[in-house]
Amino acid sequence: MLYFIGLGLSYETDITVRGLNAIKQCSRVYLEHYTSILMTASLEELEEFYGKKVTLADRELVESGAEELLRDADKEDVAFLVVGDVFGATTHTDLVLRAKQRNIPVEVIHNASVMNAVGSCGLQLYNFGQTISMVFFTDSWRPDSWYDKIWENRKIGLHTLVLLDIKVKEQSIENMARGRLIYEPPRYMSIAQCCEQLLEIEETRGTEAYTPDTPCVAISRLGSASQTFKAGTIKELAEYDSGEPLHSLVILGRQTHELEIEYLLEFCDDREKFKQDVASDQEYFKPPAWVPPPEDED
């Protein structure tokens, strides 16, 4: 059996009882270590809590070396651990399909992730649209396909969850080209850098899917004892020190409910200004009034 087990957001104890019991019966345990990190638990703490050796599975092992993960999983129990929920990345779906193609039994054990815990900032989950990822820009690569998704969400009044990039055990382009197994230090995108990149692409596109004055919520270390929320405009959050990782951002939709706004006021420096920013943003994206069709005189 190949178990896919979600670990939750922060602590070794966030795992479900069912997930922990599954780990204890596995002969091999892998921890996916490149789409997210468990913020407050080290590898050693996980191994002590599980009573099992845990092998870190980086991008290369999961995407290129799946043979190692799937080895003998049709004969013995193997666990693949994922921070948050199991299906937070398409890579995990691909791994499930590979296992099923080999007739390896698969069991999925879910857990909390940023996709549902984001509601703790006060925004209602059913008011969210498409989620996007913001990657680190480079001198030669500044992708902006996510811009269209924000535009689509905002046109129909929905919030946009922005997942901020992390780089763990990544190689530079030069080292990859030279075949050198030298890895860059870990990097975690800050709220300020995300907002700067948002503003850069808006200036390039110029269709005003959002503006510097669009209201947002900065989310830091979600699910931990030190989690924080900060409400402000993109321009304001581009100067915000969000502290230690991990971080996410929510761009508000124009249909923000009054209860959502009331909740967000707890995280503002200037409540009256934030209410005005929200009102202005909602007015900008307000659809034209409905005009009934002319009656047929016949």
UniProtKB/Swiss-Prot annotation:
Its EC number is 2.1.1.314. It catalyses: 2-[(3S)-amino-3-carboxypropyl]-L-histidyl-[translation elongation factor 2] + 4 S-adenosyl-L-methionine = diphthine methyl ester-[translation elongation factor 2] + 4 S-adenosyl-L-homocysteine + 3 H(+). InterPro entries: 4pyrrol_Mease (IPR000878), 4pyrrol_Methylase_sf (IPR035996), 4pyrrole_Mease_sub1 (IPR014777), 4pyrrole_Mease_sub2 (IPR014776), Dphthn_synthase (IPR004551). Gene3D superfamilies: Cobalt-precorrin-4 Transmethylase, Domain 1, Methyltransferase, Cobalt-precorrin-4 Transmethylase, Domain 2. One of its GO terms (cellular component) is cytoplasm. It holds the Pfam family TP_methylase. Its main location: cytoplasm. S-adenosyl-L-methionine binds at residues 9, 85, 88, 113-114, 164, 222, 247. Coiled coil: none annotated. Keywords: Cytoplasm, Methyltransferase, S-adenosyl-L-methionine, Transferase. It is found in: Cytoplasm. GO terms for biological process: methylation; protein histidyl modification to diphthamide. GO terms for molecular function: diphthine methyl ester synthase activity. Pathway: Protein modification; peptidyl-diphthamide biosynthesis. Belongs to the diphthine synthase family. NCBIfam families: dph5 (TIGR00522). S-adenosyl-L-methionine-dependent methyltransferase that catalyzes four methylations of the modified target histidine residue in translation elongation factor 2 (EF-2), to form an intermediate called diphthine methyl ester. The four successive methylation reactions represent the second step of diphthamide biosynthesis. This is Diphthine methyl ester synthase.
